[in-house]
C-alpha cells in the first residue's frame, strides 16, 4: 500500500532573523525532502506559555525568538511566500479560525492566494482556540455552530458565480453580497477541516476536501473518526473516498533512544499533552490537570499560565501518553509508527519537527540527520 504524502508546518513567530527567512528556509527544505506542501499556523499568540519560553526550556531557540507571543499574520506571509514558490509545492494555513475573521474575508484571502500560487493554495480551517478568540472579544459560546455557518458561507460565496447572494444565518448573514473573484482554472482552494467531535466530523463530510485533525492520539481512534467523516459524506451525496485523510503530528527523533526520551521529557514538548482531552489522560490512569472533563487544546489560554503552574502540569504527563501524542523514537521506529497510522487510513501527514525545541543545542543539531532519514522513509510508504 503506497501513496502517503507529507508536508511541513511552522509557527510564524517574530524572531531576530528577517521576517521571511525562516519560512523560506523551511520551504526550501520541504522541497529538497520531497514534501507536497508547506503550511503556516494562524495564531495571535503562541500555544506555548510565555512563562516557559526561556533558554532554560527552549534552549537556543529562545535566543532567536525573544517574544514567543509575537506572531505574524498568516495570509500576509503566505502572499509573500507565493512569489518564488517552487513549482510543485502547495501552500496552506494550518488552520485558520472560522469565527475570528468574517468568512467573506477568509474566502477572499484563500481565493487570492490560489490565484497567486496558480492553483496551489489550501484553506485549512477549524473552530480555532479560546486563546485566540475570547480575550479579543470574539464570541466563544458556540464555536462549532459558528464554524458550520462560516464554512457554508465560504462555499456559498465561491459558488455564487459573481451573482448577488443573500443567505440567512445567525452569525454571518449575506444580504445582496457579491463575490466576483474567479477560481483558478475552474477550481477553488481545497478546504481541509480540523475536526474532532461528532458534529465537526459530520461537517467535514458535508463540506471538506480533506480531514486534518490535530489531537487524535491513537490510530484506532483515527480510523473510527475517519469512518464518521465518510459516512457523513455519503449522507450528503458526496463520494466519501474523495476526502483526503490527513493529520497534523509532531515528530521527536534522535540518534538513539536516550536522546529521544530526553526530548520527550522537556517541559515544552510535554505541554502538547495538555491539548489532549481528559478522556485520553484517564485511559492512562491520570486526571487531566485542568479537569477530568477538559476538552483539549481549543480551551487552553496559555498566556495566563505562570511558570509554576506549567511545571506542575508538565510533571503529571504520563510517559505513555506522550508517546501517543507524537511520533517518537529512532527513525526506523517513527517510520513504523507512521505506517501503522497509514494502515488505519492516513494518507497525508503534516509534520511538526518537535526535535527543534530540545533545550540541548547539541542534541537539537544531532537530530537533524535522523529527522531527514524519517522523511526519506516516509516517501517509501
Curated annotation (Swiss-Prot):
UniProt-listed Pfam families: Bac_luciferase
Q: Please report the name of this protein according to its UniProt entry.
A: Phthiodiolone/phenolphthiodiolone dimycocerosates ketoreductase
Record flagged with keyword Secreted: no
Per UniProt, the keywords (alphabetical) are: Lipid biosynthesis, Lipid metabolism, Oxidoreductase
UniProt cross-references to PANTHER family, sorted A to Z = 5,10-METHYLENETETRAHYDROMETHANOPTERIN REDUCTASE (PTHR43244:SF1), PTHR43244
Q: What class of enzyme is it?
A: oxidoreductase
- Specify whether Transmembrane is a keyword of the entry: no
Q: Which Gene3D superfamilies match?
A: Luciferase-like domain
Amino acid at each position: 500500500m503506497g501513496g502517503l504524502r507529507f508536508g511541513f508546518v511552522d509557527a510564524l513567530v517574530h524572531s531576530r532573523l528577517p521576517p521571511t527567512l525562516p519560512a523560506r528556509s523551511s520551504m526550501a527544505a520541504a522541497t529538497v525532502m520531497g514534501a507536497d506542501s508547506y503550511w503556516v499556523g494562524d495564531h495571535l499568540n503562541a500555544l506555548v506559555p510565555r512563562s516557559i519560553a526561556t533558554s532554560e526550556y527552549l534552549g537556543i531557540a529562545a535566543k532567536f525568538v525573544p517574544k514567543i507571543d509575537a506572531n505574524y499574520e498568516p495570509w500576509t506571509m503566505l502572499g509573500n511566500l507565493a512569489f518564488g514558490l517552487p513549482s510543485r509545492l502547495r501552500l496552506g494555513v494550518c488552520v485558520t479560525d472560522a469565527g475570528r475573521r468574517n468568512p467573506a474575508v477568509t474566502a477572499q484571502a484563500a481565493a487570492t492566494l490560489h490565484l497567486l500560487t496558480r492553483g496551489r493554495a489550501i484553506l485549512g480551517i477549524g473552530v480555532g482556540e479560546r486563546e485566540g478568540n475570547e480575550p479579543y472579544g470574539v464570541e466563544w459560546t458556540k464555536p462549532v455552530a459558528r464554524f458550520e455557518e462560516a464554512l457554508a458561507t465560504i462555499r456559498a460565496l465561491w459558488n455564487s458565480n459573481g451573482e448577488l447572494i443573500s443567505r440567512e444565518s445567525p452569525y454571518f448573514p449575506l444580504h445582496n453580497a457579491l463575490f466576483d473573484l474567479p477560481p483558478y482554472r475552474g477550481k477553488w482552494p481545497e478546504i481541509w477541516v480540523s475536526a474532532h467531535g461528532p458534529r465537526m466530523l459530520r461537517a467535514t463530510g458535508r463540506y471538506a476536501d480533506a480531514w486534518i485533525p490535530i489531537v487524535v492520539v491513537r490510530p484506532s481512534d483515527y480510523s473510527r473518526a475517519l469512518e464518521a467523516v465518510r459516512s457523513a459524506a455519503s449522507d450528503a451525496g458526496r463520494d466519501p473516498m474523495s476526502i483526503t485523510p490527513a493529520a497534523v503530528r509532531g515528530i521527536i527523533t534522535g540518534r538513539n533512544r536516550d536522546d529521544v526520551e530526553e526530548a520527550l521529557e522537556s517541559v515544552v514538548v510535554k505541554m502538547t499533552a495538555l491539548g489532549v482531552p481528559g478522556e485520553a489522560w484517564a485511559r492512562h490512569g491520570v486526571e487531566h490537570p485542568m479537569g477530568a472533563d477538559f476538552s483539549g487544546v481549543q480551551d487552553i489560554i496559555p498566556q495566563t499560565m505562570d511558570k509554576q503552574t506549567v511545571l506542575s502540569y508538565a510533571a503529571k504527563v504520563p510517559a505513555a501518553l506522550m508517546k501517543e501524542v507524537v511520533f517518537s523514537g529512532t527513525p526506523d521506529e517513527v517510520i513504523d509508527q507512521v505506517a501503522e497510522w497509514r494502515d488505519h487510513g492516513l494518507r497525508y501527514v503534516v509534520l511538526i519537527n518537535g526535535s527543534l525545541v530540545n533545550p540541548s543545542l547539541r542534541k537539537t543539531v544531532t537530530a537533524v540527520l535522523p529527522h531527514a532519514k524519517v522523511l526519506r522513509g516516509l516517501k517509501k510508504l
